[in-house]
């Protein structure tokens, strides 16, 4: 009976790990990358740098463990070019998504309609106590950040930071603070447009 319970517990743990892996940002393959935005100006102008045309044998972009390595290597006709992640603005994928590197960490550029809003998916350990036993489990979590029009300064998406850095107009400041009363509310997205509601409100108030 005890052996059966252990097997059931092990199966549940394996299923949880599979689900957890699906929640993480997936490691990208070399052929996921279409090009690079070397600067913020390039990103705003949609000026994509394609370091390789992939027309020659061996042409490729090597992400070198995309989520932890400090650089990206492109190979074009046998010649290597190194791009440091902290010196370029973003990487553009063939699926249309863009990641901005902040301290070498890839943040998905989720919305640029007003504030630049970024998301970062990872996991965190949660502990619980049941009688004499203390258990831990990994749960998926998404962190939200923002910057002003893609500028260098990036801040956690909280009411305190939005008030401090983004709401310089008194009328907009009051309207935003009246509508959003918790940090969690700032994460709300309009399902029809895919944009963050705070961005839509600020744009509406600016008209």
Model-identified regions with their sequence ranges:
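Generic N-terminal leader/processing signal
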Residues: 1, 15, 119-122, 193
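Generic low-polarity alpha-helical segments
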Residues: 21, 80-83, 195-202
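C-terminal partner/receptor-binding element of secreted or periplasmic proteins
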Residues: 171-207
């Amino acid at each position: 009976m005890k052996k059966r319970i252990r097997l059931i517990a092990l199966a549940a743990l394996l299923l949880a790990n599979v689900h957890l892996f699906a929640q993480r940002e997936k490691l990208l393959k070399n052929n996921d990358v279409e090009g690079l935005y070397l600067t913020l100006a390039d990103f705003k102008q949609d000026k994509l740098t394609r370091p390789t045309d992939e027309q020659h044998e061996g042409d490729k972009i090597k992400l070198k463990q995309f989520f932890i390595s400090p650089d990206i290597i492109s190979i074009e006709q046998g010649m290597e070019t190194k791009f440091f992640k902290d010196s370029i603005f973003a990487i553009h994928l063939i699926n249309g998504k863009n990641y901005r590197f902040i301290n070498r960490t890839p943040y998905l550029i989720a919305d640029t309609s007003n504030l630049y809003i970024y998301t970062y998916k990872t996991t965190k350990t949660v502990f619980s106590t049941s009688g004499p036993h203390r258990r831990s489990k990994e749960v998926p979590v998404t962190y939200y950040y923002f910057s002003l029009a893609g500028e260098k300064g990036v801040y956690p998406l909280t009411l305190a930071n939005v008030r401090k850095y983004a709401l310089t107009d008194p009328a907009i400041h009051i309207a935003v603070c009246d509508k959003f009363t918790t940090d969690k509310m700032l994460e709300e997205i309009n399902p029809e447009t895919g944009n963050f509601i705070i961005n839509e409100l600020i744009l509406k108030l600016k008209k």
